């Protein structure tokens, strides 16, 4: 992104950007269409020890997958995030935001922001209906800590 514009003409740079965009859309569409894969991904996220390297890898994969959704059209993005939310995205984000690793909490925040972009209503519903309101509590604590310490997290201290 930084080096290529300096060496390529505008037309070639535009072509590369289009190829990257179409490839990202293809990756998201392919993974979204693979229901067993997504079910397995969320099952592993629920079953792995949050301190294990495997959990960290799965979280980073899910974060990247969520961030690729920005390249989708709004209707596709809504449908895709609805499916991810149905699989337990917000429950997983709740677990991630309670993690001791700040980089993983940042991943969780990024996933939450990606899920909010097409439609914030599912998150509002989840925050109200979640037993114990854990995610809401994490978000409030994170904002309070961030305000006072300039870096927030949800862990109980």
Model-derived features: where do they sit?
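Intrinsic disorder/low-complexity flexible regions in very large eukaryotic scaffold/regulatory proteins
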Residues: 27-33, 37, 54-58, 104-108, ...
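Amphipathic alpha-helical segments within extended alpha-helical solenoids and repeat-rich scaffolds
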Residues: 1, 31-51, 80-100, 129-149
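Hydrophobic residues within the alpha-helices of tandem HEAT/HEAT-like
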Residues: 12-23, 41, 58-70, 93-97, ...
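Alpha-solenoid ARM/HEAT helical repeat scaffolds used for protein-protein interactions
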Residues: 23-30, 68-81, 92, 118-127, ...
């Amino acid at each position: 992104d930084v080096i290529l514009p300096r060496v390529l003409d505008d037309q070639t740079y535009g072509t590369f950007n289009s190829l990257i965009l179409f490839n990202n859309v293809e990756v998201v569409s392919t993974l979204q269409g693979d229901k067993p894969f997504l079910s397995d991904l969320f099952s592993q996220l629920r079953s792995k020890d949050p301190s294990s390297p495997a959990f960290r890898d799965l979280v980073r994969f899910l974060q990247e997958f969520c961030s690729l959704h920005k390249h989708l059209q709004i209707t596709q993005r809504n449908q895709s995030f609805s499916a991810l939310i149905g699989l337990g995205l917000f429950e997983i984000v709740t677990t991630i935001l309670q993690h001791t690793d700040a980089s993983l909490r940042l991943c969780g925040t990024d996933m939450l922001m990606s899920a909010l972009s097409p439609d914030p209503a599912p998150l509002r519903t989840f925050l109200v209906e979640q037993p114990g309101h854990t995610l809401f509590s994490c978000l409030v604590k994170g904002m309070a800590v961030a305000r006072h310490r300039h870096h927030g997290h949800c862990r109980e201290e």
